[in-house]
Amino acid sequence: HKPVSTVLDFFEVEQVTLIGLSLGGCLALRAAAAEPRVERLVAYDVLTNLFDINLRQTNALPRVLLKVLLRLGATRIVNWMIAQVARKSPVVQWGLQQGMHVTGTSSAFEFLQRAKQFQTADVSASIRQDVLLLAGSEDHYVPIEQWHDQIRMLKNARSITARLFTRSESAQNHCQVGNSGL
């Protein structure tokens, strides 16, 4: 939220609509909870928990093992395990590379530890603005459950409009990108 407040201070803005795209949806929700000058908020996509999004790319047993290894600080083993998964999945490879780039981390272990900070459960009840939540019905990265969870967590929002885009609109995927026809 501090960068948003700094920008609003610099430009002497008293009311703003804040729009967050992809991970920015999570960041915009977090900023709105702390910044009363944000009057309206648009989040597409909605990421309630970046750590969970990344771990869901693995099967149940490796997911549990990864959580334990992260708690134990087993950096080399975590990095090796994630490298094996990334080799088989372009989505995991992309998510890992993009995640490390955005968070300024240099390993899978570091990124997963940092990803725990990117969640909305602790701030959602503080959001009092008008909120528009957008999601794709077949998002390859963010599970649709997080969209439903975010709607439920916004207990004090002034208003909530939630829109789920579908394949028939060519907007079913992450950030409402689909297979757009020419």
Each language-model region and where it sits:
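Alpha/beta-hydrolase active-site loop
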Residues: 1-12, 30
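Short glycine-enriched nucleophile-adjacent loop
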Residues: 18-20, 25-36, 41-43
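Active-site nucleophile loop of the alpha/beta-hydrolase fold
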Residues: 42-53
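Helix-rich cap/lid subdomain of alpha/beta-hydrolase
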Residues: 61-96
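Active-site nucleophile elbow and catalytic-triad environment of alpha/beta-hydrolase enzymes
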Residues: 105-123
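Short beta-strand/loop motif that positions the catalytic acidic residue
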Residues: 127-128, 133-135, 139
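Conserved alpha/beta-hydrolase "acid-adjacent" motif
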Residues: 140-146
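Catalytic histidine-centered segment of alpha/beta-hydrolase-like enzymes
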Residues: 163-181
